[in-house]
Regions:
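Long, structured ligand/cofactor-binding scaffold of large enzymes
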Residues: 1-12
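Thiamine diphosphate
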Residues: 16-21, 25-46, 52-54, 59, ...
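TRNA-recognition modules of translation machinery and tRNA-sensing kinases, especially anticodon-binding
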Residues: 63
């Protein structure tokens, strides 16, 4: 992926308008299939995230299949040199977003969206990335929170790069800096080091 990125960057500097290199990563993270632990790769995101100049590579980690196309269209509209989608297994049932209090799937195009908004003063913020951990949060944690657990904001990271591409005002509107003071992150990928 690095060589196509260098080639695309050079071509654009020379006035040529090359196409984006699409590096499809299939269903990555721990629960990738019925035998998930035998062919999972939690390191894969680390190989492409933060290893390119800003804007040269966009990754997406949708939580559900209905987020894939909006994320893809948004990512490709920014014309990155490399587009690296990590998609979920199509057999996952769609969550009832309205019942859970989650944002509509189209909000994934912002890169970060709410799975749950605190009803009052939030006791904290949970930021989730990766469909494996995300599914556990949707199926087990959100119902428990809604049934009387701590009043938390829960956000999902569908694309760090798309979120970072937003204007600062929009960025701060979705995830205000003060929320980060009480935030914890949950991911099923190994973070870049």
């Amino acid at each position: 992926a690095r060589l196509p990125a260098i080639g695309v960057q050079s071509a654009r500097e020379a006035g040529v308008n090359p196409t984006t290199f699409n590096m499809f990563n299939g269903h990555a993270s721990v629960p990738t299939g019925e035998d998930g632990p035998t062919h999972a790769d939690p390191q894969s995101l680390q190989l492409v995230q933060d290893n390119f100049p800003k804007g040269a590579c966009i990754t997406i980690t949708p939580l559900e299949v209905d987020e894939i196309w909006p994320l893809t269209v948004r990512a490709l509209s920014l014309r990155p040199a490399v587009f690296a989608p990590f998609v979920v297994r199509p057999s996952y049932a769609l969550m009832d977003r309205e019942a859970l209090g989650a944002d509509p799937a189209i909000k994934a195009v912002n890169g970060v969206y709410y799975l749950r908004r605190a009803k009052g003063n939030a006791a904290g913020t949970v930021i989730v990335q990766g469909a494996g951990g995300g599914r556990i949060v949707v199926e087990k944690v959100l119902p428990a929170l809604n049934a009387g657990g701590p009043d938390l904001n829960v956000l999902y990271v569908a694309s760090r790069e798309l979120f970072e591409a937003l204007p600062k005002e929009e960025h701060d509107k979705i995830l205000p800096p003060e929320m980060l003071r009480t935030a914890i992150g949950i991911t099923d990928f190994t973070l870049p080091t």
